[in-house]
From Swiss-Prot:
Basic and acidic residues biased stretches: 491-504
Organism for this UniProt entry: Homo sapiens
Gene: GOLGA6L4
Coiled-coil annotated residue ranges, if any: 157-496
UniProt feature, compositional bias: Low complexity: 508-523
Sequence ranges of Pro residues compositional bias: 1-11
Record protein name field: Golgin subfamily A member 6-like protein 4
Region (Disordered) location: 1-77, 491-552
Signal sequence annotation: none
Pfam families for the chain: GOLGA2L5
Family, as annotated: Belongs to the GOLGA6 family.
Keyword Oxidoreductase: no
Skewed-composition ranges (Polar residues): 51-62
UniProtKB keywords: Coiled coil
PANTHER family: GOLGIN SUBFAMILY A MEMBER 6-LIKE PROTEIN 10-RELATED (PTHR23143:SF19), TRICHOHYALIN-RELATED (PTHR23143)
Length: 574
């Protein structure tokens, strides 16, 4: 019998230890992420919606404040950090589960190695015992081969003593051969179990390797995603800086426009004042024109008077008052000249005023055109900025959707890995249950084999008691032959260590004698090894001899019963 294997600890205890390890790993992960990103809250949820700036935060000019864009960007960072926390926690759980499974596998391999070592040591011990017995048999064979001198039959002869010793040794050899055969069968069963366990361990190692490769791939993907997120954060920071610069420029432009509007208002006020002055001047000019008309009327009247005077002078050609009239005429002409000069000056002033008005109108038109051009340029700038903002928002939305898709794919992969890990743990539990059932079945088979051996020994003793006595010489020859055959079979048993697995049901059936058939000489069959006396006559237990030989066979059967009982005790102790 092989020693009892050391089984792994109870599954409930292993589950408790795994849960403790998982809780410790989660705490360490939370502390690590809090150290790495202190601005992120601990209770952030992965499924929170990432909303942008609200429409209520718009300014009077249609521009958003720089704080609105910053809130949306930092919201993205928080959501990505929460998803990374979930992925890292799931990865740590998988790593802890892999560590626990590797520990269980190492314990099982240690148990298997210890079983193999103990079986090898027992096999070596049995081979050593068989070699000792073979040497003693060889010595006895040499002693029996020497010619014996006839002695008086004072007591039991040397031949009978040697015969008894050979019988006893033969029985011991048979028992040792059976023990060796049982050990070989047990070793075969153990080798089969070891092979199955090695195959399962190889499969588990392959699964673990595949899972490790998948975990490595996931780690690479996580690192790539972290790099992408960092690049995106850098891009978003650059975009924020650009937006801030744009907003600063727009603020400066708005201030300039406000200053220009104030200047335009001042200019408009000045223009209003100038228009009022021009209206006053027009009124004055109208008054002057009326005065000039009155003067012209007066001049016309004076001309008529002068004509009348000339006519009178013509009538009074030689009047003494001609000189006086000429002087008056000269005075009137002088007055007319002065009036004409005044009229010319007034006309010049009026023309100058009209020219100034035209120039002022041209200036006003130019200023209005400039203002319109500025307004048009500002509208175009606003349109371009609005287009840039829309494009940036679309790019951000597309990037968010892509990141969410990647995170969902990673979560699906992690769930698949967790499902595989759960199935693997179930397989391990089933495998442990199967190993326990197989060990219990092997113990039952071992008990049945012990009972079969005891029955075989009983049948052999009965058959030897019923056998007919023969001459002692033939018995010695048969015993010598049987010892030689036993040595050969022991050598064959040493060489053949990898025989086929025995069948317990067939052995139980073969251990019983056939009902209704005559039992020939040594016709009982050993169900444990599956051989007959015709195939192996050395181990057939021939009981041909005198009554003393039959008695020796009975004593050998009693010894075998005692050895079986001692073996049972050894099994129970182990």
């Amino acid at each position: 019998m092989w020693p009892q294997p050391r089984f792994p600890p109870h599954p409930a205890m292993s589950e408790k230890t795994q849960q403790g390890k998982l809780a410790a790993a989660k705490k360490k992960l939370k502390a690590y992420w809090q150290r790495k990103s202190p601005g992120i809250p601990a209770g952030a949820n992965r499924k929170k919606k990432i909303n942008g700036s609200s429409p209520d935060t718009a300014t009077s000019g249609g521009y958003h404040s720089p704080g609105d864009s910053a809130t949306g960007i930092y919201g993205e960072g928080r959501a990505s950090s929460t998803t990374l926390e979930d992925l890292e926690s799931q990865y740590q759980e998988l790593a802890v589960a892999l560590d626990s499974s590797s520990a269980i596998i190492s314990q099982l391999t240690e148990n298997i190695n210890s079983l193999v070592r103990t079986s090898k040591e027992e096999k070596k011990h049995e081979i050593h015992l068989v070699q000792k017995l073979g040497r003693s048999l060889f010595k006895l064979k040499n002693q029996t081969a020497e010619p014996l001198a006839p002695e008086p039959p004072a007591g039991p002869s040397k031949v009978e003593q040697l015969q008894d010793e050979t019988n006893h040794l033969r029985k011991e050899l048979e028992s040792v051969g059976r023990q060796l055969q049982a050990e070989v069968e047990n070793n075969q069963m153990l080798s089969l179990l070891n092979r199955r366990q090695e195959e399962r361990l190889r499969e588990q190692e392959e699964r673990l390797r595949e899972q490790e490769e998948r975990l490595r791939e996931q780690e690479d993907r996580l690192h790539e995603q972290e790099e992408r997120l960092r690049e995106q954060e850098e891009r978003l920071c650059e975009q924020e800086e650009r937006l801030r610069e744009h907003e600063e420029r727009l603020c400066e432009q708005e201030e300039r426009l406000c200053e220009q509007e104030e200047r335009l208002r001042e200019q408009e006020e000045r223009l209003h004042e100038q228009e009022e002055r021009l209206r006053e001047q027009e009124e004055r000019l109208c008054e002057q024109e009326e005065r000039l008309r009155e003067q012209e009327e007066r001049l016309c009247e004076q001309e008529e008077r002068l004509r009348e005077q000339e006519e009178r002078l013509c009538e009074q050609e030689k009047l003494p008052g001609q000189e006086r009239l000429l002087e008056e005429v000269e005075k009137l002409l002088e007055q007319e000249r002065r009036q004409e000069e005044q009229e010319r000056l007034l006309e010049r002033e009026r023309l100058l005023e009209e020219v100034e008005k035209l120039l002022e109108q041209e200036r006003q038109q130019e200023e209005q055109e400039r203002l319109l051009e500025r307004e048009r340029l500002l509208e175009e700038v606003e349109k371009l900025l609005e287009q840039e903002r829309r494009q940036e928002e679309q790019e951000r939305l597309l990037e968010r959707e892509r990141l969410l898709d990647e995170v969902e794919e990673l979560l699906d992969e992690v769930e698949e890995l967790l499902e595989q890990e759960r199935l693997r743990q179930q397989d391990e539990r089933l495998w442990q249950q199967e190993t326990l059932q197989e060990l219990e079945r092997l113990r039952e088979l071992e008990r049945l084999r012990e009972l079969e051996r005891m029955l075989e020994l009983g049948w052999e003793a009965l058959y030897e008691q019923r056998a007919e006595p023969r001459s002692g010489f033939e018995e010695l020859n048969n015993e010598n032959k049987s010892t030689l055959q036993l040595e050969q079979q022991v050598k064959e048993l040493k060489k053949s260590g990898g025989a086929e697995e025995p069948r317990g049901s067939e052995s139980a059936a073969a251990a019983r004698p056939v009902a209704g058939a005559p039992v020939p000489q040594g016709a009982w069959m050993c169900g444990q090894a599956g051989w007959t006396p015709q195939e192996h006559p050395g181990l057939s237990g021939e009981a041909v001899g005198t009554g003393e030989a039959a008695g020796g066979a009975g004593e050998a059967a009693c010894h075998s019963f005692r050895a079986a009982e001692n073996r049972e005790l050894n099994i129970t102790i182990i």
